[in-house]
């Protein structure tokens, strides 16, 4: 992992990675450790953040309802912030904690695409943002609306894992990873 430490407070954040080479996936989570002398309250806990420095992307998300689960929604990533999530206490077929960021011409057999699956059955938030110089960011984690976790000195908090995969051969290859 990669350890980040605030030299003033002593708060530590460990970016944890797992590599499952035979499955062509990477896992990512975050551990926050309170090495301070007092309580720390976490108000947001993202498991991952991905940045693309250039490119024109779309993202695929899935929503659903009774007898129509996993309805595909393909949306251009425009300037500003776009989000999917759930504040119902659980993830579900209404909004699935899975997304694909892809180039505009990506299809089943060609094109670059990145899959992100949040391994969590609670409230979640996935956000994309395209900034003023056309960089794209994707953040995924626990939904912050009802989240507040107190860490006493010495205590830690682990975010749920995110599973990441990539394909330069379209959605078909990505779905087999």
Task: Show the residue positions of the predicted features.
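Polysaccharide-binding surfaces and accessory modules of carbohydrate-active proteins
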Residues: 1-131, 135, 145-147
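Generic detection of long, well-ordered alpha-helical segments
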Residues: 20, 39, 153, 168-172
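Acidic/glycine-rich phosphate/pyrophosphate-binding loops and surrounding catalytic core
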Residues: 118-122, 163-177
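Glycine-rich phosphate/adenylate-binding loop
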Residues: 138
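Short Pro-Gly-centered flexible turn/kink motifs
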Residues: 149-168
């Amino acid at each position: 992992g990669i350890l980040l430490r605030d030299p003033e407070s002593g708060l530590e954040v460990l970016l944890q990675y797992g590599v499952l080479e035979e499955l062509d996936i990477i896992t990512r989570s975050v551990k926050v450790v309170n090495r301070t002398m007092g309580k720390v309250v976490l108000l947001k806990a993202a498991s991952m953040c991905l940045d693309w420095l250039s490119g024109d992307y779309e993202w695929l998300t899935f929503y659903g309802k009774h007898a129509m689960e996993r309805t595909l929604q393909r949306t251009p990533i425009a300037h500003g912030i776009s989000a999917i999530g759930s504040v119902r206490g659980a993830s579900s077929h209404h909004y699935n904690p899975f997304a694909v960021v892809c180039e505009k011409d990506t299809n089943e057999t060609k094109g670059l695409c990145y899959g992100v699956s949040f391994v969590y059955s609670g409230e979640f938030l996935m956000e994309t943002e395209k900034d003023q110089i056309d960089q794209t960011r994707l953040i995924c984690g626990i939904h912050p609306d009802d989240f507040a976790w107190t860490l006493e000195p010495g205590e830690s908090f682990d975010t749920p894992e995110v599973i990441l995969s990539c394909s330069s051969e379209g959605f078909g290859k990505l779905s087999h990873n």
